[in-house]
UniProtKB/Swiss-Prot annotation:
GO molecular function, one term: glutamate-5-semialdehyde dehydrogenase activity
Protein name: Gamma-glutamyl phosphate reductase
Record-linked PROSITE patterns: PROA
EC number per UniProt: 1.2.1.41
Pfam families: Aldedh (PF00171)
Length: 413
């Protein structure tokens, strides 16, 4: 598609922004949940066509996993929609209202960001989750999904249009770029009508958007996530957290990629970890200190400690203590999700305070870095940059604040 036609799509969406913010957005979310339940087979049929083509073209297993919609996804998506609908409206509230000496009352009002461009790879569930979050906050969305999920996305956007119609909202609130041409990504990056761009996908996509964008970018970058097993850890708990983080769904950004083990518990813990991971088909790649304690692990290369596998591969490193664990995470982590397993509150609180990540956990799985699990209903992504949001981005993170002043005829002297 041409840059001109993309501009026209965006311009039509912008013109309806005020209608979206003032309209019955919760009704649209509830209508979408009902439509998904009634028409899920249509969506699955489109998804199967995408999967068949992706398999023919040799799409990697990790991407096939993200592309596939399953029966259980229906419950997750509909629960997320209904949970977001129940959340308080983030718009219109005035925060910090204070009276000045001259009687003028000033505060800051929550308003939508505006028109959001969302560029994402083969993950059709995001077409529901991301739109629901943006819509709750009164924003319009211009979507450019991965070519592998084009049929799935088209089917889901068609349902969104029906839901918007039932709620009396304009279809332009959700617009799918009608092409799989990669040039459309570059055109969106140059589209100055957008208020924000959110890329969600691999490193290559994120870097491309950050490099080419002419508007602000909120990046959902890779998840090089660690679990530190402290010397005072409950080792049975640590084993459960490692298994859940790595094997429940290895191809997602909050999956576990590295286990750091205190040297005082390494001999007791690592053989148990290897046995459990081997039963799940996980390959271990270990540091020189860990290798003698493991039967089938292979040496970890120095250049892979900052790699996101999104697969059944797990790195293991023995560390001298909390200090070395913190240094390793600071060097190789991606500011996504980090966890500590310990019964020592002092060590835990130091970890929580010093680790720089969008979610830091104590005695819990990295898999909890998710909008639904954290009570946001859903998320548009997990921001690993600190401006303008950090961590899972729910409706509140897709608003901004404008100053308002309530007067009684005051003039400046």
């Amino acid at each position: 598609m041409t840059a001109t036609s993309l501009w026209e799509l965006a311009e039509r969406a912008r013109k309806r922004l005020s209608e979206i913010a003032k309209g019955n957005r919760d009704r649209a979310l509830l209508a979408m949940a009902d439509l998904l339940e009634a028409r899920w087979e249509e969506v699955l049929r489109a998804n199967r066509e995408d999967l068949e083509e992706a398999e023919r073209t040799g799409l990697p297993k990790a991407k096939l996993d993200r592309l596939a919609l399953k029966e259980k996804d229906l419950k997750t998506l509909t629960e997320g929609l209904r949970q977001i609908a129940r959340l308080p409206d983030p718009l219109g509230r005035i925060e910090g209202l204070a009276k000045r000496p001259n009687g003028l009352r000033v505060g800051r009002m929550r308003v939508p960001l505006g028109l959001i461009g969302f560029i994402y790879e083969a993950r059709p569930g995001a077409t529901v989750e991301a739109v629901s979050v943006a819509l709750k906050a009164g924003n319009a969305m211009l979507l450019r999904g991965g070519k592998e999920a084009f049929r799935s996305n088209r089917a889901l956007v068609a349902l969104w249009h029906e839901a918007l119609g039932e709620a009396g909202l304009p279809e332009e609130a959700v617009t799918l770029v009608p092409t799989t041409d990669r040039e459309a990504v570059l055109e969106m990056c140059r589209l100055e009508l957008l208020d924000l761009l959110i890329p969600r996908g691999g490193e290559e996509l994120i870097r491309l958007v950050q490099r080419e964008a002419r508007v602000p970018v909120l990046a959902h970058a890779k998840g090089v996530n660690h679990l530190y097993v402290d010397k005072k850890a409950d080792l049975s708990m640590a084993l459960r957290l490692a298994l859940n983080g790595k094997t429940q769904r290895p191809a997602v950004c909050n999956a576990l990629e590295t286990v750091l083990v205190h040297e005082k518990v390494a001999e007791a813990f690592l053989p148990r970890l290897e046995k459990a991971m081997r039963e799940k088909g996980v390959e271990l790649r270990a540091c020189p200190r860990a290798l003698p304690l493991l039967k089938e692990a292979v040496p970890a290369r120095e250049d892979e400690w900052d790699r996101e596998y999104l697969d059944l591969v797990l790195r293991v490193k023995v560390v001298s203590g909390l200090e070395e664990a913190l240094a390793h995470i600071a060097r190789y982590g991606s500011r996504h999700t980090e966890a500590i397993c310990t019964e020592d509150p002092k060590a835990a609180w130091r970890f929580l305070e010093e680790v720089d990540a969008s979610l830091v956990l104590w005695n819990a799985s990295t898999r909890f870095n998710d909008g639904f699990e954290l009570g946001l209903g859903a998320e548009i992504g997990i921001s690993t940059s600190k401006l303008h949001a950090y961590g899972p981005m729910g409706p509140m993170e897709l608003t901004t604040l404008k100053w308002v002043a309530l007067g009684e005829g005051q003039e400046r002297t």
